Amino acid sequence: MEIPKFLFITVIAIGLSGSLTWANPLANPEAEATAEAGPEAEAVAEAVGEAEPAVSLILSLIPLASLSPAIKSG
């Protein structure tokens, strides 16, 4: 069975977007910088760190939704 080219490209794109998200420095803010900035900055950094993986997941699912008709017809 031959793997469709668009499916292969989609899997690679999702893999790359996931690795880029976890490599982002905002996901793990430095403790020293957070302590100097205060509790407000700590709350913002924590919220951003928690939201980024979800945003990456949502963005990775958008191409799959647009490919759904092509998968069903092919």
Curated annotation (Swiss-Prot):
**Which tissues does it occur in?**
Expressed by the venom gland.
Keyword list (alphabetical) reads: Amidation, Ion channel impairing toxin, Neurotoxin, Secreted, Signal, Toxin, Voltage-gated sodium channel impairing toxin
The residue range of the signal peptide is 1-23
Record-listed Serine amide modification sites = S73
Query: Looking at the UniProt record for this protein, which Gene Ontology cellular component terms does it annotate, in alphabetical order?
Result: extracellular region
Q: In Gene Ontology terms, what is one molecular function of this protein?
A: sodium channel regulator activity
Pro-peptide positions on chain: 24-53
The protein's superkingdom reads Eukaryota
Question: Where does it live in the cell?
Answer: Secreted
Annotated family: Belongs to the formicidae venom clade 1 family.
Per the entry, what this protein does is: Vertebrate-selective toxin that causes pain by targeting voltage-gated sodium channels.
Name listed for the protein in its UniProt record: Myrmicitoxin(1)-Pr3b
**Species this chain originates from:** Pogonomyrmex rugosus (Desert harvester ant)
